[in-house]
Amino acid sequence: MSAIDKLVKASHLIDMNDIIREGNPTLRKVAEEVTFPLSEKEEILGEKMMQFLKHSQDPIMAEKLGLRGGVGLAAPQLDISKRIIAVLVPNVEDAQGNPPKEAYSLQEVMYNPKVVSHSVQDAALSDGEGCLSVDREVPGYVVRHARVTIEYFDKTGEKHRLKLKGYNSIVVQHEIDHIDGIMFYDRINEKNPFAVKEGLLILE
């Protein structure tokens, strides 16, 4: 049974055992574009990927399924070399502890996403990045574009253009890297992991 056949079964919930780890060659391949109309399996896969992210952010489901929390997942991490990503970035409480009006700042399954333009300025998360396919900490600034404009297709084949900045920009770039065979630590300065070039925006 292929990876996608297993994952799209109605009874299957994606868990950490389905996620391949660094060293697996699929993570270093440039994934193939999907064509439209999508196959039923490709559509269900996108839904399952989003379901995994929701489960990973739900304390009860995460404990039950043994999940690490995640805000993004790419099909190659499931050993499926297709250009499909899911992103789910929760909003946080305000300074007074009030819940956000919208639960998520970004919630989307993207097919064939690509960066079409970006800022000159670079940015990095102050705490570095992690990855569901990497079971170790890799300290250092992961240097990315501070702002990007992306294009992607939804499951119906409709094309979207989105401008992103801040954390959402970082998350989407991390996932697009996965479909291009790039790992986050490829973008860390090997000799000086916390090197700060002039103009680098550090995001807290």
UniProtKB/Swiss-Prot annotation:
Entry EC number(s): 3.5.1.88
Record's keyword annotation contains Transcription: no
Binding site for Fe cation: 131, 174, 178
CDD domains named among the record's database cross-references: Pep_deformylase
GO MF annotation list: metal ion binding; peptide deformylase activity
Keyword Oxidoreductase attributed: no
Needed co-factor(s): Fe(2+)
Gene3D superfamilies attached to this UniProt entry: Peptide deformylase
PANTHER family: PEPTIDE DEFORMYLASE, PEPTIDE DEFORMYLASE 2
Function as written in the Swiss-Prot or TrEMBL entry: Removes the formyl group from the N-terminal Met of newly synthesized proteins. Requires at least a dipeptide for an efficient rate of reaction. N-terminal L-methionine is a prerequisite for activity but the enzyme has broad specificity at other positions.
Family assignment from sequence similarity: Belongs to the polypeptide deformylase family.
Protein name per Swiss-Prot or TrEMBL: Peptide deformylase
Organism: Streptococcus agalactiae serotype III (strain NEM316)
Gene name per UniProt: def
